[in-house]
Amino acid sequence: MATIQVRDLPEDVAETYRRRATAAGQSLQTYMRTKLIEGVRGRDKAEAIEILEQALASTASPGISRETIEASRRELRGG
């Protein structure tokens, strides 16, 4: 496993992470590890939009209506 060290983190940010870790009943290391993994493995907005656009472009039915996909895409784009 890799080790990551973050330097020059503002104290208020570090304190917020410490509080959140405590509230979650986790060590700071465990909490930060979980958040980093979730951040990478979760889909971001651009990835979600790309998936929707691929579904719209495909000839096979994605199982939902084109209107639903387009509405979801508009919502993800903030408009």
From Swiss-Prot:
Keywords: Toxin-antitoxin system. GO terms for biological process: regulation of DNA-templated transcription. Transmembrane segments: none annotated. InterPro entries: FitA-like_RHH (IPR053853), Ribbon_hlx_hlx (IPR010985). Coiled coil: none annotated. It comes from the Bacteria. It holds the Pfam family FitA-like_RHH. SUPFAM superfamilies: Ribbon-helix-helix. Antitoxin component of a possible type II toxin-antitoxin (TA) system. The cognate toxin is VapC1. This is Putative antitoxin VapB1. It comes from Mycobacterium tuberculosis (strain ATCC 25618 / H37Rv).
